[in-house]
């Protein structure tokens, strides 16, 4: 099986996981002692790390400031940076900003 076939075989799982993350209102909130960016960003980080664990990664949450996932051992690693917080949600959305909308086979929409 080539890489394209492998990726295609994981499409539904990837979209399901993306939907799990999009459903979380991760706008900057009121800081709390253990949630420096508020409740929403902490929930998004927790869910993102949970998804990574489900995929077989070891995860680390750094006091809800950020987290990372890793796999394997050794001196050389590959790092991929991303974020789960979002800008404020206004009212000009064509679709629900907290739901992954599927439009046919090849188009997915969200915020």
Residue ranges and their predicted role:
Residues 1-90:
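N-terminal helical capping/dimerization or prosegment-like subdomains
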